[in-house]
Each structure stands twice: as C-alpha cells, then as structure tokens.
Amino acid sequence: MKLDYEFFQRDAVSVAKDLIGKLLVRNLNGEELICRIVDTEAYCGPEDKGCHAYQNKRTNRTEVMYKSGGYVYVYLIYGLHYCFNVVVSKQDRPEAVFIRAGEPISGLKTMRDNRNIKSNKKTELTNGPGKLSQAMAIDKSLNGQDLVASKEIYLRHACDSQSYQIIPAKRVNIDYAEEYTDKLWRFYIRDNPFVSIN
C-alpha cells in the first residue's frame, strides 16, 4: 500500500525514522525497481542550519520544499550525483527527508546496468545517496513529482513485517551546521550492509 499524504505531512524527524523499512518504488520502462530504505536524514526547516531552507532561503531549487509533504526533491551535488529527498511537513514549512541508502529488492539487473558496474556485489548498488539515485534512475526530471499520485516513483509499506533496530546518529558531512551538527537526526538499520556509512 502506498504511503499517503497524512504520512508525509508530519515533522521531518518522525518521517525520517518511520521511512526506515519502507519501500522506494521506481517504475522504469514497465519494470519496477524496488529498494528497502535503510538510511535517512531529517532536515528540519528554517531553524536547521544544515537545511537548504535555513532562514527561509527560498530559491528555484528549494521551492518544492515549501509544498505540503509528499513531493520529490532532487538536487545535484558536486556536479555529479543526484540526491533524492522527500518533502514533508505542512505547506510553507520547508522540511525534507534525505534518503541516504537502500537495500535492493527487485530489478537488480537494471540497477546494475544503470550504475554501469560489472561487480556482482549487491551492496555496491545502492549503499550511498548517489549510488541509490543512479541505480534507481532518479534525476532532476522527477523533481516536484507527487509521491502519492505518481506512477513513476512512490513509497509504500513493505509486505513483510520485519522489525529493525534503528540507530539514531549525527547527520553526515554537515560540519558547517554549528549546533545542528550534533543533532541525532539520521536513522539507519543496525548491521545492515547497505547503510551508507556507520
């Protein structure tokens, strides 16, 4: 079952934690590529010095963050890697959850082709934000997509009822965020080999 607007229209920390174990589905040329989300980070609006919308800096890039929760926010880093985020919270409250890594469930051959790697090491496919986006064919063309209405990309509950030990941690590579550097707003599954970094 797809996640609904009610799920997304909550604060980023709650959604980031609750997205662990959910499935990211990308429909690509009639094939479903599916990853279980194993690693997330919350970015908590204008007060959060690590957030793109810190001090309500509203730009063309961040405009989608001001929508109500349930939209895709994709941006490029280092001119190379696309980063996939989920807009959360209420209209005009710019919060997002960054999806750092996933565990491939379905469509592994296509993911491998998308990543252009020969290695059969499954963990190499999606164990980081750039790798995940490349494997799942996530790019700027998906920016602003409605995750509830879209058939191209969406999030859903997993059919299994696995339980996970979720570890809270500091977010990665935001040393500039001063007191927000130490917030435990990253969540990942303990001992999962697809987590980006431990």
Swiss-Prot record:
GO terms for biological process: base-excision repair. GO terms for molecular function: alkylbase DNA N-glycosylase activity; DNA binding. The keyword 4Fe-4S does not apply. Keywords: DNA damage, DNA repair, Hydrolase. It is an enzyme of class 3 (hydrolase). Its EC number is 3.2.2.-. The keyword DNA damage applies. Belongs to the DNA glycosylase MPG family. This is Putative 3-methyladenine DNA glycosylase. The lineage of its organism: Bacteria, Bacillati, Bacillota, Clostridia, Natranaerobiales.
